[in-house]
């Protein structure tokens, strides 16, 4: 019988108390690569997709 315990995954998803002030920044960090991807299209539009 396979016993999977997912409580460790839940605990790892929460920042320790010492890093609580950085929580809003951590929420935004995954969006940054998407912004760079969109910036590439803006850049290519600026140079007329050469």
From Swiss-Prot:
Signal peptide: none annotated. It comes from the Eukaryota. One of its GO terms (cellular component) is chloroplast thylakoid membrane. Its main location: plastid. It is found in: Plastid, Chloroplast thylakoid membrane. It holds the Pfam family PsbK. It comes from Euglena myxocylindracea. PSII is composed of 1 copy each of membrane proteins PsbA, PsbB, PsbC, PsbD, PsbE, PsbF, PsbH, PsbI, PsbJ, PsbK, PsbL, PsbM, PsbT, PsbY, PsbZ, Psb30/Ycf12, at least 3 peripheral proteins of the oxygen-evolving complex and a large number of cofactors. It forms dimeric complexes. Belongs to the PsbK family. This is Photosystem II reaction center protein K. Residues 1-13 form a propeptide. Keywords: Chloroplast, Membrane, Photosynthesis, Photosystem II, Plastid, Reaction center, Thylakoid, Transmembrane, Transmembrane helix. The chain crosses the membrane at residues 25-45. One of the components of the core complex of photosystem II (PSII). PSII is a light-driven water:plastoquinone oxidoreductase that uses light energy to abstract electrons from H(2)O, generating O(2) and a proton gradient subsequently used for ATP formation. It consists of a core antenna complex that captures photons, and an electron transfer chain that converts photonic excitation into a charge separation. GO terms for biological process: photosynthesis. The gene is psbK. It is a single-pass membrane protein.
């Amino acid at each position: 019988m396979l016993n999977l315990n997912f409580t460790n995954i839940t605990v790892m998803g929460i920042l320790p108390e010492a890093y609580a002030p950085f929580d809003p920044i951590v929420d935004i960090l995954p969006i940054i690569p998407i912004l760079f991807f969109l910036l590439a299209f803006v850049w290519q539009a600026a140079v007329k997709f050469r």
